[in-house]
């Protein structure tokens, strides 16, 4: 893991080079504070250096307007004012005049200087900030710009009463902003790394090198005891030395095929601020969750109606569709409870649950964000596995209970007639077909008791189990912050997880373009852009997961692939899949 990946994981504002920074990207860096009213970005105006240049040039012009005799007489000894003016120009702009006299700037040169003042890339404070992004540096930049704007407003004349009133309002707003910045400056202070060095030792984490990272630092060394023993002891020592609470991460950093253990230290106030900004447990977040839940229930109800036989009445809808609806909600409910219980066991806070409505399967799963730090890789692995495993088990339990209650595989009295495309070209279901036979024809092209032009009779609860398996497998794809992406990050690290995420996005795109699958297109876009990225690092990424969790990961991967990957041979005849069967496609 390189240090650049750490910057991406833990800081909102970062840049690879000051030469590529723009005013737009700078404003993004400072939006970190706006939610808590610590600062608001204001445009950079002309600085005092430009005013000094203008003043110096004005003095030079006045000296040239003096009598020629006095000007020639000054050859033996220059006027003190001219000398001071020349030094001011030289100090502000780095221009050296060999004769010691004033040099009149052209209009183009002045415009260029003004543009440099407006351009944030010429700001030295900004350059230092981009070299090491930190909240303290951002506050200093905003405070400097607020002071500059206040001075600029104070110099403007109040000839127009209305303009004076507006300037007064702006001045008051800037003054309040400056007060907030001063308050934030007292809260967010960069840690003194020299003081922190003495906190590391042979009995905790032996540090051999340190480098600045944000307002904290990265200590390179090696761990001497298990993380669960070292972290509380070291956090207490560092907090006492720094005078503020801190948060620690223990990670492995790879450079030039050499793996080193590192301990990253950051002020706790800054991490709390970052978590506060991304928190979805707000009134708007809960309102959005309710709106998505209502929409998802509607799509499940609409999708369920597609499987009724022609000429079905409302009573048929109630008797046939409600079991499917209840089965789907059972899968979602059980998996949600398992997820939250597992997260609570590790002390991880979860955001509200956001259902993903779908016109194909009714629902494409549930989204949750982590609203607190993950203590270790076990938490990063166990929480998504709890959701996936519970959803799989509930789906299978529903299907088995439906078959047992019906006493057959025909769907019973209230069977849904499911389009065969839900079973087509899938290795897992093809295997099920081979086991449960007999087939309806000699060629083995259809499921038992299938009715051509109507579909395959399936019990509603059994079909809910099938949909639950498919939706769970979609969420197990190793892409972004889907459950599968989180599992991949826990098992293989962020670097390998990023490669798997990219490969999965490409595969989904290929399925959409080559195979013409709308589901691949929609899910690929959702997984890449809505749930893309990676989770914030766990505080302990050094302690290994153990072979048992790798085995569980392999089992889930096999089930996911068997459920989603097509098999080349197929199971159905082209006539059975063609018109006039379809009443709506996937």
From Swiss-Prot:
Sequence ranges of Basic and acidic residues compositional bias: 62-73
Main localization category: plastid
Superkingdom classification of source: Eukaryota
Organelle targeting sequence: 1-54
GO process annotations (BP): proteolysis
Region (Disordered) location: 62-118
Keyword Coiled coil: yes
EC number in record: 3.4.24.-
Compartment(s): Plastid, Chloroplast membrane
GO molecular function annotations of the record: metallopeptidase activity
Disulfide bonds: none
Family assignment from sequence similarity: Belongs to the peptidase M50B family.
General function of this protein: Probable membrane-associated metalloprotease that may be involved in chloroplast development.
Name used for this protein in its record: Probable zinc metalloprotease EGY3, chloroplastic
Species, as recorded: Oryza sativa subsp. indica
Upper lineage: Eukaryota, Viridiplantae, Streptophyta, Embryophyta, Tracheophyta
Gene that this sequence comes from: EGY3
């Amino acid at each position: 893991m390189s240090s650049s990946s750490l910057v991406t994981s833990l800081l909102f504002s970062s840049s690879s080079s000051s030469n590529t920074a723009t005013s737009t990207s700078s404003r993004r860096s400072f939006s970190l504070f706006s939610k808590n009213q610590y600062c608001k970005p204001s445009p950079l105006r002309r600085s005092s250096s430009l005013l000094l240049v203008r003043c110096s040039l004005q003095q030079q012009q006045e000296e040239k307007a003096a009598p020629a005799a006095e000007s020639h007489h000054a050859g033996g000894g220059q006027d003190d004012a001219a000398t001071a003016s020349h030094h001011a120009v030289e100090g502000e702009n780095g221009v050296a005049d060999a004769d010691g006299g004033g040099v009149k700037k052209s209009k183009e040169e002045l415009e260029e200087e003004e543009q440099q003042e407006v351009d944030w890339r010429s700001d030295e404070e900004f350059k230092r900030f981009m070299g090491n992004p930190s909240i303290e540096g951002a506050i200093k930049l905003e405070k400097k710009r607020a002071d500059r704007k206040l001075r600029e407003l104070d110099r403007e004349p109040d000839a127009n009463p209305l303009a004076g009133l507006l300037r007064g309002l702006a001045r008051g707003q800037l003054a309040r902003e400056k007060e907030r910045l001063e308050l934030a400056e007292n809260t967010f202070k960069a840690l003194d790394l020299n003081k922190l060095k003495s906190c590391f030792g042979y009995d905790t984490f032996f540090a051999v090198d340190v480098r600045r990272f944000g307002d904290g630092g990265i200590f390179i060394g090696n761990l001497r005891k298990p993380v669960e023993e070292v972290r509380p002891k070291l956090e207490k020592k560092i907090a006492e030395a720094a005078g503020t609470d801190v948060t620690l991460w223990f990670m492995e950093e790879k450079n030039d095929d050499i793996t080193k253990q590192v301990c990253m230290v950051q002020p706790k106030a800054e991490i709390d601020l970052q978590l506060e900004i991304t928190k979805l447990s707000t009134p708007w977040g809960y309102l959005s969750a309710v709106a998505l839940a209502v929409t998802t229930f509607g799509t499940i109800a609409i999708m369920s109606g597609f499987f009724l036989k022609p000429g079905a009445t409302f009573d048929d809808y109630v008797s046939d569709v409600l079991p499917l609806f209840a089965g789907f909600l059972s899968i979602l409910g059980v998996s949600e409870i398992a997820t939250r219980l597992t997260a609570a066991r590790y002390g991880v806070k979860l955001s509200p649950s956001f259902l993903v409505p779908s016109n194909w399967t009714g629902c494409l799963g549930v989204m949750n964000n982590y609203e607190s730090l993950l203590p270790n890789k076990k938490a990063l692995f166990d929480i998504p596995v709890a959701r996936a495993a519970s959803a799989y088990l509930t789906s299978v339990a529903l299907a088995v209970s439906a078959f047992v209650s019906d006493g057959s595989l025909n769907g019973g009295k209230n069977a849904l007639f499911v389009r065969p495309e839900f079973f087509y070209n899938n290795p897992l279901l093809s295997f099920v077909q081979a086991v449960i036979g007999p087939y309806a024809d000699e060629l083995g092209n259809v499921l038992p008791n299938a009715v051509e032009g109507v579909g395959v009779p399936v019990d509603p609860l059994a079909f809910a189990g099938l949909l639950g398996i498919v939706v769970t497998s979609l969420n197990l794809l190793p892409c972004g912050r889907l459950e599968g992406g989180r599992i991949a990050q826990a098992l293989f690290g962020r670097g390998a997880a990023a490669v798997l995420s990219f490969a999965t996005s490409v595969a989904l795109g290929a399925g959409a373009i080559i195979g013409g699958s709308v589901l691949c297109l929609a899910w690929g876009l959702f997984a890449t852009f809505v749930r893309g990225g990676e989770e914030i690092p766990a505080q302990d990424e050094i302690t290994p997961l153990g072979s048992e969790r790798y085995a569980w990961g392999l089992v889930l991967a096999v089930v996911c692939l068997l459920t989603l990957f097509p098999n080349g041979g197929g199971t159905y005849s082209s006539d059975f899949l063609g018109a006039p069967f379809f009443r709506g496609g996937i």
